[in-house]
């Protein structure tokens, strides 16, 4: 009987060991499967994250390039506006320098000779030019002054003059600002071509 108990104990040990080994193998197999699933999921997630990061990077790059292009366009437009403004200011200064007393006197006399044959006209000058030119114009225009031609000071004119029919709708602006604006509009297409070359 002693052998039987011993055999029985050995059999229980053996069966327990086999069961434990079987259970351990099953646990290991499940752990390996779970680990493989985790690795596959991690690889899939990593791949998705990488694709998402690449897409975001490409989108950011596209937006950055578009923003850079827009900034360059804005810079070109701003530079062109600044150059135009400088050109226009220089043009106005040049025209104003040409409008000295001699030039104004000669221009007013020519305009009056051509235009005032049958019309009554008003000529408006700035106050400074009015004071400087009135006596010279009286001498040159003579008896037509005050009757057919009236010369008046006007604060709104910096350099040059305006001329208009007294009772009519005709009005001409020979101010330095207007002449400079007309010249600028005439020169503007040529100016744009020069800027494009730069």
UniProtKB/Swiss-Prot annotation:
| Residues forming coiled coils | none
Gene Ontology terms: biological process: proton motive force-driven plasma membrane ATP synthesis
A GO CC annotation recorded here is: proton-transporting two-sector ATPase complex, catalytic domain
Q: Does the keyword ATP-binding apply?
A: no
UniProt keyword list? ATP synthesis, Hydrogen ion transport, Ion transport, Transport
One GO MF term: ATP binding
Q: Which domain of life is it from?
A: Bacteria
InterPro entries per the record? ATPase_V1_Esu
Q: Which HAMAP family match?
A: ATP_synth_E_arch
Record's function text: Produces ATP from ADP in the presence of a proton gradient across the membrane.
Q: Which family does it belong to?
A: Belongs to the V-ATPase E subunit family.
Query: What is the name of this protein?
Result: V-type proton ATPase subunit E
**Which classification does the entry list for the species?**
Bacteria, Pseudomonadati, Spirochaetota, Spirochaetia, Spirochaetales
Record gene name:
atpE
């Amino acid at each position: 009987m002693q052998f039987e108990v011993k055999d029985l104990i050995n059999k229980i040990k053996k069966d327990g060991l086999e069961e434990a080994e079987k259970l351990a193998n099953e646990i290991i197999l499940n752990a390996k499967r779970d680990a493989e699933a985790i690795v596959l999921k991690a690889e899939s997630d990593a791949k998705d994250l990488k694709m998402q990061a690449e897409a975001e990077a490409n989108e950011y790059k596209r937006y950055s390039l578009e923003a850079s292009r827009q900034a360059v366009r804005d810079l070109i437009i701003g530079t062109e506006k600044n150059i135009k403004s400088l050109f226009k200011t220089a043009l106005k200064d040049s025209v104003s320098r040409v409008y000295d007393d001699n030039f104004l006197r000669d221009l007013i006399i020519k305009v009056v000779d051509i235009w005032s044959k049958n019309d009554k006209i008003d000529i408006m000058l700035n106050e400074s030019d009015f004071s400087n030119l009135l006596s010279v114009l009286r001498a040159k225009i003579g008896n037509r002054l005050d009757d057919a031609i009236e010369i008046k000071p006007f604060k709104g004119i910096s350099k040059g003059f305006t001329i208009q029919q007294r009772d009519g709708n005709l009005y001409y602006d020979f101010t330095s600002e207007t002449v400079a604006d007309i010249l600028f509009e005439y020169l503007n297409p040529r100016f744009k071509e020069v800027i494009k070359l730069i």
